[in-house]
Amino acid sequence: MEDSDSAAKQLGLAEAAAVAAAAAVAAAAAAAAESEAEEPVLSRDEDSEEDADSEAERETRRVTAVAVMAAESGHMDMGTEALPSPDEAAAAAAFAEVTTVTVANVGSSADNVFTTSVANAASISGHVLSGRTALQIGDSLNTEKATLIVVHTDGSIVETTGLKGPAAPLTPGPQSPPTPLAPGQEKGGTKYNWDPSVYDSELPVRCRNISGTLYKSRLGSGGRGRCIKQGENWYSPTEFEAMAGRASSKDWKRSIRYAGRPLQCLIQDGILNPHAASCTCAACCDDMTLSGPVRLFVPYKRRKKENELPTTPVKKDSPKNITLLPATAATTFTVTPSGQITTSGALTFDRASTVEATAVISESPAQGDVFAGATVQEAGVQPPCRVGHPEPHYPGYQDSCQIAPFPEAALPTSHPKIVLTSLPALAVPPSTPTKAVSPTVVSGLEMSEHRSWLYLEEMVNSLLNTAQQLKTLFEQAKQASSCREAAVTQARMQVDAERKEQSCVNCGREAMSECTGCHKVNYCSTFCQRKDWKDHQHVCGQSASVTVQADDVHVEESVIEKVAV
């Protein structure tokens, strides 16, 4: 009985030690997560090493064993030692018990629930324990990395490196089903990776060193709608920003942060829906008894700049082919868009030929630009003779002249030159191959040439007559312009003189009246006349007396009668 009682007590101590060890594992994971959250800035080498480790471990999908052992130095293993036999366990039952905790990575990223099985591996004589207890470590534990942890029963941790992600406190009991995802939390639905608590109705926010709680149901347009509670007071996002000392920024969406990111990120992912400035709902009016329509904020879409290049590909210019017809062999000039000219075949040009050729340009998408009738020396056209005939000899128009070939120095192959000439009467492409030219055709060409010279002479004469007429008209217009300018100048001088005569003597303005005594001084008003009268009265009286003396009438003595008094 005493052995059984002591074994039962040891069993109770072992179970208590297992629960305490599991709690220590969770506390160690939480401490590691907090240390990583407080120090998000890592060196470049550490980031690269952790990324490499996480990728390698995702591919292998390992299962890591976590061993929780007693404080005795003889059992300080990393989980590789075999479990003790029943006799050894009975001898060491008074000191410690070995418990194995297995943490398995979960393949699905949507289900972040870890289940931990704690099994009593030690055996006591006469009592074999086969019970299993399920523990839930946390819903949001990161599955990227998990390593071996050795925890003593006294709570001290031997190794906690490599465990990433926050962990919730251990909750002994049956395994709970995973928490369903909120709407919009599906994979690929948001731009940023958010914690599930972001879908709560209340969010802890911060602006500089001031923290508050944002209530989504009371969010308005930013300037209106007191949705942030700080202490016992309610503030709108703009007021909360100003209280934190960021009023000059005037951008509460980037000043106020949640989980290290500005609220603009929540708005972009559709988690927060601010109202428009013209909204008249209850939240914007700060009166929950109202029921006005809700107008959501619509972000402004920037227009594309006008100077942006079009998205359609630029059409490349196809090279143009220039064919000289007629010729002995088909010869093609290819003009590339860069301006380079390439030829195919050999050409022989007549430098001194005077054949009346016609340049015809035809628009064809396949062949390009075709010039027909160039001064190309053909096989049927002979060089001019040395007797004195300037015209070349054609087949069927032979005479007794001896045709001498060109000397080698005068051959056009050394300095080739293309001469294109055109006539108004012959600007037609040849429809048939070149045939023998008859004498009537040659005479017709000579007549057409003479007619064209006459036409050019008449045109030059008409141009000369027109130029002479234009010169005469130019001289007449020049004389008329000078006369008009002289008349305008004379009229202007007369007007200026009249203005000077009729100006007020006192102030210089335009005069409206004149002095009734002498009729020589003008005034604009009675005020100027009274002001100038002190000086003018002497001049006005003298001129009147002089006028009277000049008007005296002399009477002869014979006419005067003596009157007795």
From Swiss-Prot:
In what tissue types does this protein appear? Ubiquitous. Detected in brain, spleen, adrenal, lung, skeletal muscle, liver, kidney, and in developing germ cells in testis. In pituitary, restricted to hormone-secreting cell types.
| Name of the protein | Deformed epidermal autoregulatory factor 1 homolog
Q: Where is the segment annotated Interaction with LMO4? A: 403-478
Q: Phosphoserine (modified residue): where?
A: 176, 443, 448
Q: Where is this motif: Nuclear localization signal?
A: 301-316
Which residues participate in Zn(2+) 2 binding?
515, 518, 536, 540
Q: Give Gene Ontology CC terms.
A: cytoplasm; extracellular region; nucleus; RNA polymerase II transcription regulator complex
Q: Name one GO biological process term.
A: regulation of transcription by RNA polymerase II
What is the species listed in this Swiss-Prot or TrEMBL entry? Rattus norvegicus (Rat)
